[in-house]
């Protein structure tokens, strides 16, 4: 039985079992499974207790006994050595080196616990270095837990991250925070550097909002600088705005920016040649790995020096390092203006990598995710050019709206697929670095189980059912019901390989 990997080849892969009609209710086999499971599977709202972001979410005694200090430093790790999985005869797989686990907030925190306890720990003997990035604990540690987590990823090489809250004014008031802390993703990216790559999870049974997209579109987002490290301020009244650069061994150079006649706003931002070069190398390497052409897009016609620097560095590195490899694989690299590239992207069938600046990549990755069917079907990985650090997470947020429903005791149907893939992509990287193919195979089998439950059995969460045009209640299941189906499918797939 072959494993599933998500690349250009996956988009062309045909499944052996035909997908059910999109307008039909769940298949009879799916209904039988859910009916037989109803005595043990309840809605997520009744099965998982609401927890404060400050508390650990693991149901295991190991996690519940951790101290606050251990949550911060990650020194207290999971060392589970049971020889068999629950209710199965499948041997546990040893993960050679640790994986850094970054917990998160709200609905995704609850789902994260379920994934860890039901789909990861029963099958893997893994040392998890745990850091609680829940908003309240970040506030308690003055956000040092985020810095420590990033340093741990540097040390161990691989991290998996749950979605987290980036506070705004309303969140500061809600959580009574000391201050409006920065985005933990931004903090981690600025410490690790590298490039964020977002790739769709393609499920043939889920129709695309952009129907022509038959091949993956991978967004490479430069994970450093620009607006995300900008200094901005409100200008209170008339005055002169200037930009001053002072060389280490030279006289200050002053550039006039604007003469304000009244109030306004101003912003300065920056990037570095070193970071742009790393971005270029990571982008070219990803394109070669996936066997796809690469497009780099900027607005260099307007930002002639700023965006022009990106364009020039990419071209220089392509010609000096990667052109021969691209041509040997019949691939190409091209710079295109961002507005032209976005228009061409919508008209295309997919099948390429886009290298984008920080803000452009942030926006376009969500557009691509929704175009392929759902924000819940998009992976996000942070990759450094030399491969010394790798972090994977879901591309979506903490699903606050579902969490509010959960707090009221109502059932929720939150798509966990991207969060599951955050674990699997991290495990695949860990297995590759450690040269442990059984770890890679397990992660690929878990990904395959997620896809097959939707594609072959018609069991899906509400967002995917709506994408299929199915609004009736019987068309979708709760989060825990979906994950129970994935667990069943995973066990069957693993047993068939023994």
Swiss-Prot record:
GO terms for cellular component: mitochondrion. Keywords: Glyoxylate bypass, Magnesium, Manganese, Metal-binding, Mitochondrion, NADP, Oxidoreductase, Transit peptide, Tricarboxylic acid cycle. Substrate binds at residues 166, 183-189, 198, 221. NADP(+) binds at residues 164-166, 171, 347, 397-402, 415. Its main location: mitochondrion. The record marks 228, 299 as: Critical for catalysis. InterPro entries: IsoCit/isopropylmalate_DH_CS (IPR019818), Isocitrate_DH_NADP (IPR004790), IsoPropMal-DH-like_dom (IPR024084). PROSITE patterns: IDH_IMDH. It catalyses: D-threo-isocitrate + NADP(+) = 2-oxoglutarate + CO2 + NADPH. Binds 1 Mg(2+) or Mn(2+) ion per subunit. It comes from the Eukaryota. Mn(2+) binds at residues 339, 362. It is an enzyme of class 1 (oxidoreductase). The keyword Oxidoreductase applies. Its EC number is 1.1.1.42. One of its GO terms (biological process) is isocitrate metabolic process. Its cofactor is Mg(2+); Mn(2+). It is found in: Mitochondrion. GO terms for molecular function: isocitrate dehydrogenase (NADP+) activity; magnesium ion binding; NAD binding. Belongs to the isocitrate and isopropylmalate dehydrogenases family. This is Isocitrate dehydrogenase [NADP], mitochondrial. It comes from Aspergillus niger.
């Amino acid at each position: 039985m072959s494993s599933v990997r998500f690349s250009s080849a996956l988009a062309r892969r045909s499944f052996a079992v035909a997908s059910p009609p999109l307008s039909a209710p769940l298949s009879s086999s799916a209904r039988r499974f859910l009916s037989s499971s109803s005595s043990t599977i309840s809605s997520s709202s009744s099965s998982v207790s609401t927890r404060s972001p400050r508390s650990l979410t693991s149901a295991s005694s190991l996690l519940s006994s951790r101290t606050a200090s251990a949550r911060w430093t990650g020194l207290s790790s999971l060392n589970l050595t049971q020889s068999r999985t629950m209710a199965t005869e499948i041997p546990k797989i040893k993960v050679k080196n640790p994986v850094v686990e970054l917990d998160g907030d709200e609905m995704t925190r609850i789902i994260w616990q379920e994934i860890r306890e039901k789909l990861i720990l029963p099958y893997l003997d893994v040392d998890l270095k745990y850091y609680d990035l829940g908003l309240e604990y970040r506030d308690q540690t003055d956000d040092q837990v985020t810095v420590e987590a990033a340093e741990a990823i540097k040390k161990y090489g691989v991290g998996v991250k749950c979605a987290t809250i980036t506070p705004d004014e309303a969140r500061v008031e809600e959580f009574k925070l000391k201050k409006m802390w920065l985005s933990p993703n931004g903090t981690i990216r600025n410490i690790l550097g590298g490039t964020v790559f977002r790739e769709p999870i393609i499920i043939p049974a889920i129709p695309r909002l952009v129907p022509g997209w038959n091949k993956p579109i991978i967004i490479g987002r430069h994970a450093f600088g620009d607006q995300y490290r900008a200094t901005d301020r409100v200008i209170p009244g008339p005055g002169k705005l200037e930009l001053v650069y002072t060389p280490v061994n030279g006289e200050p150079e002053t550039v006039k920016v604007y003469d304000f006649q009244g109030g306004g706003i101003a912003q300065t931002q920056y990037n570095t040649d070193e970071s742009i070069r790393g971005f270029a190398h990571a982008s070219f390497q990803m394109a070669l790995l996936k066997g796809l052409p690469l497009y780099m897009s900027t607005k260099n016609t307007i930002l002639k020096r700023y965006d022009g620097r990106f364009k020039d560095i990419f071209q220089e590195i392509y010609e000096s390092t990667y052109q021969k490899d691209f041509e040997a694989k019949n691939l190409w690299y091209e710079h295109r203006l961002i507005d032209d590239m976005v228009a061409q992207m919508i008209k295309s069938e997919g099948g390429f990598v886009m290298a984008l600046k920080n803000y452009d990549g942030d926006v376009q990755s969500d557009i691509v995710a929704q175009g392929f069917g759902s924000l819940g079907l998009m992976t996000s990985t942070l990759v450094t050019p030399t491969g010394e650090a790798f972090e994977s997470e879901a591309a979506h947020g903490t699903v606050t709206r579902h969490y509010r429903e959960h707090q009221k005791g109502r059932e929720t149907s939150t798509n966990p697929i991207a969060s599951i893939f955050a674990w699997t992509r991290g495990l695949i990287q860990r297995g590759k670095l450690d040269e442990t193919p059984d770890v890679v195979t397990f992660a690929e089998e878990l990904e395959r189980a997620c896809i097959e439950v939707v594609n072959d059995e018609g069991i899906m969460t509400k967002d995917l059912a709506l994408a299929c045009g199915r609004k009736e209640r019987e068309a979708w299941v709760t989060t825990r019901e979906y994950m129970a189906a994935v667990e069943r499918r995973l066990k069957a797939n693993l047993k068939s390989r023994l």
